[in-house]
Structures are given as structure tokens and as C-alpha cells.
């Protein structure tokens, strides 16, 4: 073989081998902290600190300020742990909380603990079983070596001695023994946000567990996990949530709902009222939606009541396409107005139900509590209990509202400035909702004073998106250029 060709082949082989070795070392380094996470953990959170700070546009100075804030000391220049590698938090099957991080300088970490000791927040470092140890605020036990650090608790007294033994086992376990080899962790690995989490539904707070069981119609949360991802996009804080289950009945229910809530076409986006407090949209076939509504006792009773005057079932069966609901103000809730500022719009397959309008009017006339009037062959007003409801059809779109102003508003498509940024994203989703939170937070602040909800005033609205049933995205949307994440974290 030609010596030149041989040299090229050897060089290429060495380059490939070197690349593989470097990649393996980087992977090994990146996963050092993961090696201390137990395989039996019921919840795991992964935090990519530098990615999060980069996405939130933190400067070096602001990043340093955040570290000092977290370490409760202005004297700390570097944390001693590698913030370019993931930090893991977890909950054990016994309910212990833990945090694992990769160490990049054990001496710096020890020095930082000495600063905390001088402030009365940590005990003097002692060496035991091959690791350095310190108790932070008496109930959080920390151990570290040159590779990784582990913090666990809360625990005191004899329980802390038992925890120390458990921590030694976690620090010494192999890759095969840690969470990295568990199917549970694989769900977390699929999340690419700078902050990601996977949790067994059973470890959630009782209130949330009860709500989930009620909404999912299950008697147990066994074999149900929630995967979460949090990231920032300019002036948006985004949370992605996935419901993961092996329960056969629940999987079938989610599949059925996926068939009912079809991809949104965007047919009614331009009709959103610019003053909408709440706006929702989905795409359904009326007959399937009616079957779903009848499964809920309260809604089934309400439908029976509506059908005594108007054939609401027939009206609903004609729906085929995008459906929107909107609430334009809090006036009704506060008792300032008797008219309900809510409107429903729905694309129709047909208008056959209008053929029953003469029968509706006769039925209402025979019922003293109701009065039904037709302003046009396709527009009606129903009066009952000193209230009124307007409904009808315009351009093959059904409208139903409790407000005369919304009933008389232009029902044809007219471009407006509302939801301009989201308009292209709405198409293809199975559900979308947008809530203007400014009026709500101002109202709460007015009557309740300062509360943790004041932070919501930094945002304009909250959007809820559903791709497939079981996958949700919540977006907190702030004014452009507001640096909302910095304001929340640094308190600016």
C-alpha cells in the first residue's frame, strides 16, 4: 500500500478514536452527578444552569449575583460545582429529598462551606468514609469528593446518621445501579428544556392528586407519570407537560378524546374580540361532543333543560369545525352588569335546525317563564328570569351569547390585533386558551393587598395549548423586552 495513503488512513483512525474518546469523556463528565441519583427515585429534576441563564439572557455579572444569592453569601465568587453540567434533584421512595452536582473544584466548594459556617449556616467540614461532610442549617447533610457532591434531607439526630449511610451508598453506586438505567429516567432524557422533571403522580400534593384522579376518572394514580419541561423564549416562560401512563383504560380514554378534539383549522381566529379576557378554541364534530357532554350528570341535566325550549341537541349536532368561546370582562362576576359577557361561535355543517324555529317560538309561548322572539329568520332572543340570551347563524357560523353588544357585533371575519403572535401557532393544535391576567391580578391586589400573585403582573396573559390529548404547553407571555425572568429571579 502507498505510504501516503497508509499515513492518511492511520491519521483518520487516530482522529476518529480521539473523537470517540473525547465524546465518551464528556458524556462521563456530564453524567457524574446522575450517578448519585437512586434508580428507585419517584421524582427527578434536571437543571442545566448555564443553558437556562443563556436563554434568559443573563450577563456574567447577573449570573454571579444569582450564585451569591443562592449561596447566601456575597463573598462567594465561584460555587465549586460545575454549572456546565446538569444538576439533579430527586425524591427517594422513602420521601427524602436530594440534590446531586458535579464538582469542578473541591477546594473552592470547601471554602464556600467555610463561609457558610462563619455565618452560622453550616458545621465544620469533617472527613468520613472517603468523603468530606457538613450539615447545612442543621438538617441538610452534604458530602462531596473531587468528582461529585450530594445534599440530602431534611433529617436530624439518629435519622441523620442513617441518612449518612444511605448517602455513602449513593455516592459509591455504579452507573448500572443509578437512575440512568431506569425506564423512569428515559422519559426525562427525552425532555430538552433547561429545567426538566419526571415524577410519579403518587408523589404529588394531595390536592393535585385528588384533582387528577377526578379529571382522569381513575381510582388510582399507579403507573401514571408526569413529565415537565420549563424554558424561556424571549419574553415567554414556557412549561411543557406530558401525561405518561400504562393504564389500559386511561390510554384508551386519551385515544378517544384525541378523536373528538381534532386539529384546529383557524377558521375563527380573526373573530376574537380585542377586549377578550378569556378566549378558547377547539375543533369538534357536534355529535361526538354531545356524546361526551352527556357523560357528565350536571351537563346532561342542563342539556335536558335547554331542550325544553330550543332543540339544542339538533343545533349541536350541526356543528362541524372550529368552536370558540370568549369572555370579554369581569362585569358579570362582580355584579356590575346583569348581561353575561360570554359568546360562543361554532362552524356549522348545516343549518337544518333553523327549520324548527316556529316550533321553538310556540313552545316558549306555552311556557310562562320563557319568551322567544325572532329578529330575523336566523337571529333569536330568548328571555328568561329577567335575563336574555341571543343566538343565531351568520355565514354558516352559530353564535350564542348573553350580551347584546356581542350579539350585535360584526359576526363576519374582520382582522384585529388580538393574538397576532399566536395566530399561526394555533392551527394544528387540538385546544387553545388565552387568559388576559392583568385585570385579574389588579383586582386581586385591590381587594387582597400584596400577594405572591403580584408576580403575575409582569405578564400580559397565560396561554394553554394542547397538541395531542395528554400533552400540554402553558406559556406565560410578558411585554416585549421586559426581561421577565431576571425580574422574577433577581427581584429587579
Q: Which stretches of residues belong to each language-model region?
A:
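Positively charged n-region of N-terminal signal peptides that target proteins for export
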Residues: 1-5
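Hydrophobic membrane-insertion alpha-helices, especially the h-region
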Residues: 7-22
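Leucine-rich, highly hydrophobic segment in Treponema pallidum outer-membrane-associated proteins
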Residues: 16-18, 174-283, 287-290, 427-492
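Ser/Thr/Pro/Gly-rich low-complexity linker/stalk segments immediately outside membranes or between
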Residues: 22-44
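A cross-kingdom feature marking solvent-exposed beta-strand/loop segments within repeated
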Residues: 30, 69-75, 114-142, 198, ...
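Short extracytoplasmic
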Residues: 41-67
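Single conserved position on a long alpha-helix in the C-terminal lobe of the eukaryotic protein kinase
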Residues: 45, 79-183, 324-425
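Extended non-catalytic domains of envelope/secretory-pathway proteins
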Residues: 185-188, 207-208, 248-250, 256-357, ...
Amino acid at each position: 500500500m502507498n505510504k501516503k495513503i497508509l499515513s492518511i488512513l492511520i491519521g483518520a483512525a487516530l482522529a476518529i478514536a480521539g473523537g470517540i474518546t473525547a465524546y465518551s469523556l464528556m458524556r462521563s463528565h456530564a453524567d457524574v452527578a446522575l450517578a448519585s441519583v437512586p434508580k428507585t427515585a419517584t421524582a427527578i429534576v434536571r437543571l442545566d444552569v448555564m443553558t437556562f441563564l443563556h436563554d434568559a439572557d443573563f450577563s456574567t455579572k447577573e449570573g454571579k449575583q444569582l450564585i451569591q444569592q443562592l449561596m447566601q453569601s456575597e463573598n462567594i465568587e465561584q460555587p465549586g460545582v460545575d454549572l456546565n453540567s446538569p444538576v439533579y434533584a430527586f425524591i427517594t421512595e422513602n420521601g427524602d429529598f436530594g440534590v446531586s452536582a458535579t464538582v469542578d473544584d473541591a477546594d473552592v466548594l470547601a471554602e464556600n462551606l467555610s463561609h457558610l459556617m462563619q455565618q452560622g449556616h453550616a458545621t465544620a467540614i469533617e472527613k468520613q468514609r472517603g468523603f468530606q461532610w457538613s450539615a447545612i442549617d442543621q438538617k441538610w447533610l452534604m458530602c462531596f469528593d473531587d468528582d461529585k457532591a450530594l445534599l440530602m434531607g431534611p433529617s436530624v439526630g439518629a435519622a441523620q446518621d442513617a441518612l449518612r449511610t444511605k448517602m455513602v451508598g449513593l455516592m459509591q453506586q455504579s452507573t448500572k445501579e443509578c437512575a440512568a438505567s431506569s425506564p423512569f429516567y428515559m422519559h426525562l432524557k427525552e425532555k430538552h428544556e433547561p429545567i426538566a422533571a419526571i415524577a410519579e403522580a403518587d408523589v404529588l400534593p394531595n390536592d393535585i392528586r385528588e384533582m387528577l384522579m377526578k379529571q382522569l376518572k381513575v381510582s388510582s394514580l399507579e403507573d401514571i407519570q408526569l413529565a415537565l419541561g420549563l424554558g424561556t423564549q424571549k419574553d415567554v416562560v414556557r412549561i411543557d407537560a406530558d401525561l405518561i401512563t400504562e393504564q389500559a383504560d386511561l390510554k384508551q380514554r386519551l385515544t378517544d378524546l384525541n378523536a373528538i378534539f381534532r386539529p384546529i383549522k383557524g377558521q375563527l381566529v380573526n373573530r376574537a374580540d380585542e377586549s377578550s379576557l378569556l378566549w378558547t378554541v377547539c375543533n369538534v364534530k357536534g355529535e361526538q361532543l354531545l356524546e361526551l357532554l352527556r357523560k357528565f350528570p350536571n351537563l346532561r341535566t342542563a342539556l335536558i333543560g335547554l331542550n325544553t325550549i330550543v332543540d339544542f341537541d339538533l343545533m349541536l349536532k350541526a356543528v362541524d369545525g372550529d368552536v370558540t368561546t370568549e369572555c370579554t370582562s369581569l362585569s358579570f362576576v362582580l355584579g356590575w352588569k346583569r348581561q353575561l359577557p360570554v359568546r360562543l361561535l361554532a362552524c356549522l355543517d348545516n343549518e337544518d335546525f333553523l327549520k324548527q324555529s316556529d316550533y321553538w317560538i310556540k313552545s316558549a309561548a306555552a311556557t310562562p317563564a320563557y319568551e322567544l322572539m325572532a329578529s330575523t329568520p336566523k337571529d333569536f332572543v330568548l328571555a328568561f328570569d329577567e335575563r336574555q340570551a341571543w343566538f343565531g347563524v351568520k355565514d354558516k357560523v352559530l353564535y350564542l351569547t348573553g350580551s347584546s353588544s356581542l350579539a350585535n357585533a360584526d359576526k363576519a371575519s374582520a382582522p384585529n390585533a388580538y393574538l397576532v403572535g399566536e395566530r399561526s401557532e394555533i392551527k394544528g393544535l387540538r385546544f387553545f386558551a388565552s387568559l388576559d391576567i392583568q385585570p385579574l391580578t389588579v383586582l386581586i391586589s385591590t381587594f387582597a393587598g400584596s400577594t405572591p400573585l403580584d408576580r403575575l403582573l409582569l405578564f400580559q396573559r397565560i396561554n394553554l395549548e394542547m397538541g395531542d390529548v395528554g400533552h400540554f404547553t402553558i406559556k406565560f407571555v410578558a411585554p416585549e423586552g421586559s426581561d421577565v425572568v431576571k425580574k422574577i429571579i433577581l427581584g429587579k
